[in-house]
Amino acid sequence: MAILNELYPSVPYNVLAYTPPSFLPDAGTQATPADLTAYEQLLKNLEKGINAGTYSKAIADVLKGIFIDDTINYQTYVNIGLSLITLAVPEIGIFTPFIGLFFAALNKHDAPPPPNAKDIFEAMKPAIQEMIDRTLTADEQTFLNGEISGLQNLAARYQSTMDDIQSHGGFNKVDSGLIKKFTDEVLSLNSFYTDRLPVFITDNTADRTLLGLPYYAILASMHLMLLRDIITKGPTWDSKINFTPDAIDSFKTDIKNNIKLYSKTIYDVFQKGLASYGTPSDLESFAKKQKYIEIMTTHCLDFARLFPTFDPDLYPTGSGDISLQKTRRILSPFIPIRTADGLTLNNTSIDTSNWPNYENGNGAFPNPKERILKQFKLYPSWRAAQYGGLLQPYLWAIEVQDSVETRLYGQLPAVDPQAGPNYVSIDSSNPIIQINMDTWKTPPQGASGWNTNLMRGSVSGLSFLQRDGTRLSAGMGGGFADTIYSLPATHYLSYLYGTPYQTSDNYSGHVGALVGVSTPQEATLPNIIGQPDEQGNVSTMGFPFEKASYGGTVVKEWLNGANAMKLSPGQSIGIPITNVTSGEYQIRCRYASNDNTNVFFNVDTGGANPIFQQINFASTVDNNTGVQGANGVYVVKSIATTDNSFTVKIPAKTINVHLTNQGSSDVFLDRIEFVPILESNTVTIFNNSYTTGSANLIPAIAPLWSTSSDKALTGSMSITGRTTPNSDDALLRFFKTNYDTQTIPIPGSGKDFTNTLEIQDIVSIDIFVGSGLHGSDGSIKLDFTNNNSGSGGSPKSFTEQNDLENITTQVNALFTSNTQDALATDVSDHDIEEVVLKVDALSDEVFGKEKKTLRKFVNQAKRLSKARNLLVGGNFDNLDAWYRGRNVVNVSNHELLKSDHVLLPPPGLSPSYIFQKVEESKLKRNTRYTVSGFIAHATDLEIVVSRYGQEIKKVVQVPYGEAFPLTSSGPVCCIPHSTSNGTLGNPHFFSYSIDVGALDVDTNPGIEFGLRIVNPTGMARVSNLEIREDRPLAANEIRQVQRVARNWRTEYEKERAEVTSLIQPVINRINGLYDNGNWNGSIRSDISYQNIDAIVLPTLPKLRHWFMSDRFSEQGDIMAKFQGALNRAYAQLEQNTLLHNGHFTKDAANWTVEGDAHQVVLEDGKRVLRLPDWSSSVSQTIEIENFDPDKEYQLVFHGQGEGTVTLEHGEETKYIETHTHHFANFTTSQRQGLTFESNKVTVTISSEDGEFLVDNIALVEAPLPTDDQNSEGNTASSTNSDTSMNNNQ
C-alpha cells in the first residue's frame, strides 16, 4: 500500500528542489508529435546504434514512438534522419539500417515491431487522401501496394545477404560467391529504382500523379542513399568486378544526374498541381490549396531539398552529420469560427487584405524573428440569435499583438453584452503547437433541451496547447475540445491571421475563421556552429540567408526549405554566426545567378577578417549539376580566403558574415554553410623494395605506418597514391591489434588510386601492403585526419636548473608541510593542474629522476583535492554524477586544462546546464564552505549556489582564455584584472562562500550548485569545480544563518502541509483501486471506469525543478506517479473488457456508425459519444477467445438519456439480450449473469427518443461468486453518477 512518506518523503526534501529529478516527458508525449527535442534524442540513439551495430534497437524505439506512444511523426523522423547521410559508418553503409526504418517488418530487432506498425508508404496514405480530398480507390491502392511490395522483397534480400556477410566477419572474410550474391542484390535494387520510379508520376490522371509524388520522393531518397553507399563502400564490397574505379566514376555521374532529375521532377509536378487550384474564390477552396501546399511541402519538397547532400563529392563523409535548417512557413491550421454552412469552410469568402507579409500568397508570411507573438485578445459575445431562441456565443474579433504591432481581425460592435475580452499571453520559449476548439452544443441556463438543429454552429471555447504540454485557455465558455487542430510535426504557431464573416445580417464583419502560420522550430534558433556531440563529432551546418540580421529581399522559393534572399546590385546582407569551438572551417554559399556577378565577401571575427575580398559568383544557368528552383539554378560555392586558401580559422565567439553585390545582376542566396576541417597530419611513405605478405595472413613484416596516439581515433583517413609501371595489383591492409579493419585495393600498372578509411573509436592502427604477390617500387601518400588529436606543435621542455627550482617550489607550495599529507588552504584544484602542466614539461633526459618525484607529489595533491571535494566528478571524470542538459558534453584537450572539461552549449530548444546537490549528511554544522571553479570561456553563464534560497546567483562573462607561453615561473593563463580592493584577480577563476548552520537531516536542504546558460547565444567551458570546507562560523555568522534557516523552515512546513492536504486523499483513493493497495499489482475485480475517473488529480504549485526547467520537481514526480497508477488501472480495465474503445476517447473508432453519432465534449469536460436521435446508433462485433457457453458476463453502462443496448448472439443471431437505460443524469447501469450461445456477439447502442449520451460501456467476465453471493439470474442495477472516465484525458 502506498503511504505518504513513500511518495512525499521527508528525506530527501527541499522546498526548492527534489533529488533525483527525472526528465520531463518530451512535449510530444503529452499532446502531438510536436517537440523537435524528442526527434533529436532518437536521432542520437540511431547514430550511436549504426556505429555500434545496435541500430535495430534504436529503430525499434522509433517505431514504438510512432505506432504505440503516438509521439513521433513517421515522415518527419525519416526526413530528419537523412541528416546522418554524411556520417562515417561501418562497411554496411547507411542504406542497410534505414531498411528497417522504411519497412517496420524488416527491422531485425529481438522485439517484434508494434502490431499496428506500417511501412512509411502505408503511413503516408492518410495525408495523401487529405491532400486530394478523397479516399484512395481500390485500383490506386492495388497499384501503390504492388510497387512497394516488390521493393520490400528486394530490400529484404539485400538486407539478408548483408547480414550473412557480417555474421562471417565482413567482406574480407567471405568467399567470392557470397560477394557476388550481394552485389547482384545491390544492382537489382539499383535497377528497380531506375525502372520503377517514373511510374509513380507518369499517369493520365492528375490525382494519380499527385498521390504518387510522396512515394516518388521517398523512393528517390532511398535510391540516392543506395548510390552513395555504392560510391563510398563499393570498393570495400567488390573492388574487382562490379565496383572498380571506373565503375565508381560511372556511379558518381549517376548520382549527380539523378539528384538533378529527381529534384526537377518533384518541383515540376508540384507546380503543375499548384496551378490547378487557380485563384481561390472562397475560404473552402483557399484552405484546400493550402492543404495541398502543406502536404506537398512536408512529404515531397522537404525531401527534395536534401537531395544534393547525397553527393559524396559535394558533401563527403566527415566526423558528424549535416544539419540544413528550414525556415519556410506553411499556412496551417484553418479554424472555422462562424461560417455560412455550419462549422465548415464552405461558401465563405476570403479576405486577406489585412494580412501582413502575405502578398497574395507570394510573401514569406510574418518573419518569426521580427514578429514575435506576444498576446491574443479575444472578444466573445453572448447574444440572442434568430435560431430557436437560444443564446449562441461567437467571436466578434481577435486582436493579435506581436513585437511589431497590434492588429485587429474582425469587427467590434457598437453595443454588445460582451463577456470579455479574454487574454492569452504567449511565451516565445514555450510556443503554441496545437489549437483546440469547443463548439457550442449545450443549452444555456433555463433552456429545456439541446439544440439539435444548430446549422449555424459557433465556437464556445478556444484553448492553445504549448510545446511543454500545458494549455492556455481563452476563457470563452467551454475551453475543452471536440475539434483538434494540430500543426505539422516539429512546427509552432508563429502568427495568426483572421478573415471576416461577410453576410447581410447582424453578424457581418466578425471573425469567420482563423488561419495559423506554422514555422519550423529551428527557424528562430541562433546560428550555432562547432557544437560537438558526445563522441566529439562536429556537424556541418547550413543556415538560410533568410535568417540574416539585415539586408536582402525575401523572394518565394519552394524547393530549398527556405525562401531565397535576393541581393540586388549595391545591396548588402549580413548574418551572425556563433561558434562554440574554435577551429578551422570551410565556408560555402549556395546561390543562383543568371549572370556572372562580383560579390564582396567579408568574414568579420571581431579583430580579424580572414575573408575580405571580392568573389566571383559565376552564372549558374548552364551548370550541369545544379538544381533548378523558382529563381534559378542553385549551386554550392566554396569561398576562398584572402590568401587563396579555403580554410578559415574561426574563434569561439559570435562573428558576422557580410556580402555586398558589386555586380550588375541579382544574386539569389539560399544558405551559408560551415564545414568543419579536421586537423590533418600527412605522412608520406617511400619503400623502394617491400615484400607483400599473404592476403589472408597477418603480415609478419613491419608496418608501413602506425598510429601513436593514446586517444581513441574517430574520423576518416584519406589514402592516395600511385603504383609503378608493370606492377601487380595489391591490397593496402589496415590492422587493429590482430585483425583487419579494412582493406583497400591498389591497382597495378602505374595507376592512381584513392580511397577512404572510416575510423571509429580505434586506439591504434597499423598499415601494411599485402597480396599474394611481390610488390614493386612505389610510393603511398597517407592523409590522416583525426578530430581528437589535439593541438599540434612540439611541447615545451624545461632543461635549465632554475626551471627545476621554480617548479619544485610551486609543487611544495601546494602542501602545508613537507609530509605532503594536507593541501594549503588557498590552493584550488585548478592550481594543482597548472603545476602538473609544468612538471610534465620538465625534460625527461635532463631531469628524469626529479620529474618522477615531483609527479608523485602532484599526484598526491590531486588525490587530496579530490578527497576534500564534496562534489563528485568535479573534473568531469564522472559526468554521470551531474544532472545536465541534453546537449551538454564532456570535452578534452584544452590548452588551459589538464583534465577534461564540460561544454555548456547555447540552449537551443532545451536548457543548457549542469547541477549537483551535496547531501546534508556530507556537511558539518556551523561551517563555511567554498564553492569554486575554473572557466576557460563563458558568455552569459549563470552561477547559482543554494541552501536556503539561492544565496549566490551571478551571471558572468569570461573572455576566451588563451594560454601564455609556458614558463616555469609565470601563470599558464591569462591577463589578470583589477578587483574592487585594488588587487589583481583572475577572471577565469570564481570562488564564493556559503554558510551552513545547524544540520537538518529531516528536510535535507544540503548545498545545491548549478551552472546554466541564460542567453540563446551563450556558452561556457568549465572545469575544476569544487565545494570544500573552509572554516567554522563566527558567533555573529551563526546567528545570521540561524535566522535564515528558521524562515526557510517556516515556509517549508507551510508548503508541505498544503501539498500534503492535496495529495493524501488521492493516495487513499488510488490505494482503493488495487488489491492490497499495491499500485504495481492487480486492480480489484469490482473497479469500473467511474472509479478511476472519479479520482481528480490535484493542481500542485511546483511541477518543474527550480533550476532545471526540463526536469520534474518532487511535486512533479508525485503527479507522474499518480498518473502512472491511474494509467495502469485503466489499462487493466481495457484488457479485461471485451469491447474496444468502449470509453469513446478515440471518437467512434472500432464502432460501426449509423446516423450522426459522434464524440462531443461537454461543459464540464466530459468526452462522450452523442446519439442525437432515434436514427443514430453504433455497433461492434466481438469474438470471444476460449469461448465457454456456461461462462457469465457482466455489462456495465454509463450514460445519460433514453436508449438501449442490445447483444445479439447465437447462430444467425437468434438470441437478443436487451438492456434499457433511462436516466436524466449520467448514471451507471449494469446487467449481470449474461451468457452467450456463440463466440460472436454484436453489441449495439441506440437512442430511443432524442439525445442519448454514452460515456462508456464495458462487457467483462463476471467475477466468481463468493459464499454469500449467487451469480444465477439475469439482473440489472443502476448507480447515479456525475463522473466520467473522459475528463480531459
UniProtKB/Swiss-Prot annotation:
Domain of life according to the entry: Bacteria
Region of interest called Disordered, as start-end residue ranges on this chain: 1263-1289
GO MF annotations in UniProt: toxin activity
Q: Which UniProt keywords apply?
A: Sporulation, Toxin, Virulence
Q: Pfam families from the xrefs?
A: Cry1Ac_D5, Endotoxin_C, Endotoxin_N
Which residues lie in coiled coils? none
Any one biological process term the GO annotation gives: symbiont-mediated killing of host cell
The keyword Nucleotidyltransferase appears for this protein: no
- Low complexity composition bias: which ranges? 1274-1289
Q: What does this protein do?
A: Endotoxin with nematicidal activity.
Q: What else is known?
A: Toxic segment of the protein is located in the N-terminus.
Q: Which family does it belong to?
A: Belongs to the delta endotoxin family.
What name does this protein carry?
Pesticidal crystal protein Cry5Ab
Tell me which species this is from.
Bacillus thuringiensis subsp. darmstadiensis
Taxonomic lineage of this organism?
A: Bacteria, Bacillati, Bacillota, Bacilli, Bacillales
